[in-house]
Amino acid sequence: MSRFIISSHSPNEEGNVVRVTPESAGWEYVGFEVYALTKGQTLRKETIDQEACLVLLKGKANIHTRHERWENIGLRMDVFEKIPPYSVYVPSNDVYEVQALTDLELAVCLAPGKGTYPARLIPPSEVGVEMRGAGNIERRIHNILPESKPADSLLVVEVFTPEGNWSSYPPHKHDQHNLPHESYLEETYYHQINPDHGFMVQRVYTDDRSIDETMVVKNGDVVLVPKGYHPVSAPPGYEGYYLNVMAGPVRTWKFRNDPDHEWVMESKLAAKQK
């Protein structure tokens, strides 16, 4: 298996099914966890020096922090309903407690925090929805925590790729601290597949090909993108979902397309406008 794939496992005693830390990934900023909680189960964590974005992938929950409480949040029972999720932003030096009101799949997105912003609910109505690309590189985007919304480090977005389509395409990268042209951002991809016995294909490669891996990704896999371009393909018969977490020294998403393939987007958009 590729060193960039972290596979999910059966829930442990606290419900965790996958975990990425900066230490385990060999980088500095991004952490990511998923919990599969049964109805009535409770998860309690301190954020310490990290901020967190709790994304309710599916199911309903009560969530409270040190100063805030939200009851009976959650709307979708499956990510492929394509309804924007409920999420909760939690600053560093805080605590969160999640009580599952139904079986619950919860993503915990983590990055360094400074305690600048208070805890808040991010309801579906505040999630920006857009269609990006055209033709067989068109995909649906849910901007959960974009750079236009307050946070210290985190950027969080989910993407739906129709069967037979590509996303994160044209291949792009954000691994150089070269503003305003490109920002350095580490990134995780948490994949789900419908039907769940299918697979996605993801490539991670650099200009000099010091990294050049093409991976078969299963349902529940996390792909690490420390640097390089990272396109995704959904084979016929299977639609893909992924939740992206990004963070780096500056909270901005400035990317560079692979110049060999940048023309594809222009070609697809031109065909769409005809």
From Swiss-Prot:
Pathway: Polyol metabolism; myo-inositol degradation into acetyl-CoA; acetyl-CoA from myo-inositol: step 4/7. SUPFAM superfamilies: RmlC-like cupins. InterPro entries: Deoxy-glucuronate_isom_IolB, IolB_Bacilli, KduI/IolB_isomerase, RmlC-like_jellyroll, RmlC_Cupin_sf. GO terms for biological process: inositol catabolic process. Gene3D superfamilies: Jelly Rolls. It catalyses: 5-deoxy-D-glucuronate = 5-dehydro-2-deoxy-D-gluconate. It is an enzyme of class 5 (isomerase). It comes from the Bacteria. Involved in the isomerization of 5-deoxy-glucuronate (5DG) to 5-dehydro-2-deoxy-D-gluconate (DKG or 2-deoxy-5-keto-D-gluconate). This is 5-deoxy-glucuronate isomerase. The gene is iolB.
